[in-house]
């Protein structure tokens, strides 16, 4: 029985109860959200190391995903395992293995072993990889793709990205809608190239019922990928993007009827003035399915600092209702990220998600910020470290340049909070400034 099927029968599962406790909401709230398809809990029972269940969707905190995985040029399994550890250490709510080089099955197994949070994959990468090794990518059969999906389910993958909206009809819309950067989704591009070369329909769309059968068997959440997402501001919110979203909205309903959890992936390169519209359109067309976005990236020109640019867009999108942010790293658009890049990306997007939670009125986020302010006013450094999103970094910076006073080394005896208190109460909590 899937989480969705259990929720519809009125059953509160162990995972629902866990999510409710973590989020500070009632188990019934979570159950109702899952039953309605507005919350998903990626949870494949075969993922034995998964202990930190995550709820993604409306009424819950904004989540962050961290991508990792090998590439054609760089295959270092231990480094990818380290990336997974680093991502989880700094707060990634889920991780995705996007490996395209080396022994993909072995790499996935190693990452599953250390992934205490849900793990996602993009099965077409492995299906393409196998076909390319045998002959060429275009030789991939539909059966081979579904075989890979089945294998991922058996191994314990919790959610899979499937580019079901890249249909022949939507590719016609794309071809008739001039773009600056074409198709930028790797999985979507692979599927589109395969379809155009062979003149065949997307098997994930044509055989969607088969996909649902596999997903239901392993309770794999379907992450319906946006293969036609815009890859530049010039292409944002165009006809191809919306045409694909309309198709995805229909498939969300089919997934729900089949008892399969589904969330929807979104852009991408979107200017700030279009972020709200993109979130609202997605929620409207998909029956408020959880929205999992890449960024959003509000400028095309931040190469080397896309994690910062993406966090800006992600915070705004989260405020408007996006449910999970896929991080960007400093290496985005430039190369395969290192563990340090992963750390920087997760930190930037956890801050963005937290900012969105505050704006959405999340009670726990608001309380944490209030307590931080109180500790700051008291010059309670241990209290501040405990409440900081990243305590170790806060402590390191404080101790790196200490002060002779109780304040920090920026103001020292000129700390305004201390000075005002000194006047109001007739004494200071530390030394008054001297010449």
UniProtKB/Swiss-Prot annotation:
Q: Name one GO biological process term.
A: thiamine diphosphate biosynthetic process
What InterPro entries is this protein classified in? ThiC (IPR037509), ThiC/Bza_core_dom (IPR038521), ThiC/BzaA/B (IPR002817)
* Ranges in coiled-coil conformation: none
- Cofactor binding, note field: Binds 1 [4Fe-4S] cluster per subunit. The cluster is coordinated with 3 cysteines and an exchangeable S-adenosyl-L-methionine.
Among the GO molecular function terms of this UniProt record, one is:
4 iron, 4 sulfur cluster binding
Which catalysed reactions does the entry list for this protein?
5-amino-1-(5-phospho-beta-D-ribosyl)imidazole + S-adenosyl-L-methionine = 4-amino-2-methyl-5-(phosphooxymethyl)pyrimidine + CO + 5'-deoxyadenosine + formate + L-methionine + 3 H(+)
Q: Which residues bind Zn(2+)?
A: 269, 333
Instruction: Keyword check for S-adenosyl-L-methionine, yes or no.
Output: yes
Disulfide bond residue pairs: none
Q: Name the domain of life.
A: Bacteria
Task: Return the NCBIfam families for the record.
Answer: PRK13352.1, thiC
Q: Which family does it belong to?
A: Belongs to the ThiC family.
Q: What does this protein do?
A: Catalyzes the synthesis of the hydroxymethylpyrimidine phosphate (HMP-P) moiety of thiamine from aminoimidazole ribotide (AIR) in a radical S-adenosyl-L-methionine (SAM)-dependent reaction.
Its recorded name reads: Phosphomethylpyrimidine synthase
């Amino acid at each position: 029985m899937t989480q969705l099927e259990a929720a519809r029968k009125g059953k509160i599962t162990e995972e629902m109860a866990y999510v409710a406790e973590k989020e500070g909401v009632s188990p019934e709230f979570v159950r109702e959200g899952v039953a309605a398809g507005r919350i998903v809990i990626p949870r494949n029972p075969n993922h034995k190391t998964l202990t930190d269940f995550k709820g993604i969707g409306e009424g819950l905190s904004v989540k962050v995903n961290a991508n990792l995985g090998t590439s054609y040029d760089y295959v270092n399994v231990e480094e990818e395992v380290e990336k997974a550890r680093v991502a989880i250490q700094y707060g990634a709510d889920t991780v995705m293995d996007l490996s395209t080089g080396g022994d993909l099955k072995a790499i996935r197994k190693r990452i599953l072993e250390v992934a205490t949070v849900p793990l996602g994959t993009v099965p077409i990468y492995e299906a393409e990889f196998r076909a390319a090794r045998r002959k060429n990518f275009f030789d991939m059969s539909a059966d081979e793709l579904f075989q890979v999906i089945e294998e991922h389910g058996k191994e314990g993958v919790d959610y899979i990205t499937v580019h079901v909206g890249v249909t022949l009809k939507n590719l016609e819309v794309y071809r008739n809608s001039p773009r600056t950067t074409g198709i930028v989704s790797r999985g979507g591009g692979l599927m589109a190239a395969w379809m155009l070369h062979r003149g065949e329909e997307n098997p994930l769309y044509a055989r969607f019922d088969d996909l649902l059968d596999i997903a239901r068997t392993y309770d794999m959440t379907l992450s319906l990928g946006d293969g036609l997402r815009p890859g530049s501001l010039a292409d944002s919110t165009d006809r191809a993007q919306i045409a694909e979203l309309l198709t995805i909205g229909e498939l969300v309903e089919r997934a729900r009827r089949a008892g399969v959890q589904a969330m929807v992936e979104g852009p991408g390169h979107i200017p700030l003035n279009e972020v709200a519209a993109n979130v609202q359109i997605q929620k409207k067309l998909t029956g408020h399915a959880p929205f999992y976005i890449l960024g959003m990236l509000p400028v095309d020109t931040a190469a080397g600092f896309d994690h910062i640019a993406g966090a800006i867009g992600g915070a705004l999108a989260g405020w408007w209702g996006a449910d999970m942010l896929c991080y960007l790293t400093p290496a985005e658009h430039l190369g395969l990220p290192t563990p340090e890049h992963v750390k920087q990306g997760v930190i930037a997007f956890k801050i963005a998600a937290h900012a969105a939670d505050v704006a959405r009125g999340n009670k726990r986020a608001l309380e944490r910020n209030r307590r931080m302010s109180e500790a700051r006013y008291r010059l309670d450094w241990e209290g501040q470290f405990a409440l900081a999103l990243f305590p170790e970094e806060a402590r390191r910076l404080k101790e790196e340049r200490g002060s002779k006073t109780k304040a920090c080394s920026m103001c020292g005896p000129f700390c305004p909070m201390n000075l005002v208190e000194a006047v109001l109460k007739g004494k200071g909590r530390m030394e008054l400034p001297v010449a």
